[in-house]
Amino acid sequence: MYNILVCDDDREIVDAIEIYLTQEGYHVLKAYDGMQAIQMLEREEIQLLIIDVMMPKLDGIRATLKIREKSSIPIIILSAKSEDVDKILGLNIGADDYVTEPFNPLELVARVKSQLRRYTKLGNLPADDGENVYQVGGLLVNDDLKEVSVEGEPVKLTPIEYNILLLLVKNPGKVFSIEQIYESIWNEEAIGADNTVAVHIRHIREKIEINPKEPRYLKVVWGIGYKIEKQ
């Protein structure tokens, strides 16, 4: 059974989310501010976090920043704000997905399932038989061990970042449009996906490139999309 932590200062929202997730067979833990969420993550084995932006003591943005220092579990941000700038901020600080309040509970459950599928797949550690190892120059992705390294140095990616990089590195030289990347990774129609994909691409570059502004591996093809450059 997956443990999901729901953090929101509105107890009615937390209780409502708990009802829907419990019906799907998940075990729900509850917190009502960012500090409580961090403390619970230190004590419990949590597979996914749903966290609100506006909260007392420690808001969702600062809490997510602190959590990302130690954990790569999927994080879904809840916020009453709907502007692109707020979505980008949530993704910039390490969130994997973003849901605007008021939200459709069934949509939230679907997003939870989607994130957990990726997280579970990323956590599988089958025997390393070398068949699923992809190397481009000094960039190495071992999909059996779910590990990434650059010039022998390990790189820590979030589940979304890993899956984007894996898609590209399995097809060096092939250009993927933003829509292709989004639909392959998120398994949903790419409506307004430009900013979402761009933010994750930037995060990947910051982790695998010596100079992200002059990338060696992850290249943009202006007006078309992104690719892993053949070496």
Task: Report the location of each language-model feature.
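Receiver (REC) domain active-site loop signature in two-component systems and cognate sites
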Residues: V53-M55
